[in-house]
């Protein structure tokens, strides 16, 4: 692999990591906003975990999965994932990361 190609690849990988982290942060904030609040523990248990160019948003409270599956006020993470505005904002963060890194 040429030196130039290796440099481009390195920058692209760095941009992907930054973009993924920024996009997941947006998703986490929207999911927390949609989370039903009684004590705040569920909302406070939201975490973003990244590994390389991918990651996840999770709620670690013991009752998070059960609460997510309820009809009333449920699906707070899933619905945030499918929201077109959230998806657009996440995509924009990835685009910005690539634009900044690939100058």
Write out the residue ranges for each language-model feature.
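Short, Lys/Arg-rich flexible segments
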Residues: 1-103
């Amino acid at each position: 692999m040429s030196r130039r190609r290796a440099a481009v690849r390195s920058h692209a990988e760095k941009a992907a990591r930054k973009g993924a982290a920024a996009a997941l942060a947006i998703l986490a904030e929207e999911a927390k906003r949609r989370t039903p609040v009684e004590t705040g523990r569920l909302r406070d248990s939201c975490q973003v975990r990244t590994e390389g160019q991918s990651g996840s948003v999770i709620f670690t409270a013991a009752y998070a999965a059960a609460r997510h599956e309820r009809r009333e006020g449920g699906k707070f993470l899933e619905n945030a994932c499918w929201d077109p505005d959230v998806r657009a904002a996440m995509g924009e963060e990835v685009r910005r990361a690539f634009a900044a890194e690939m100058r």
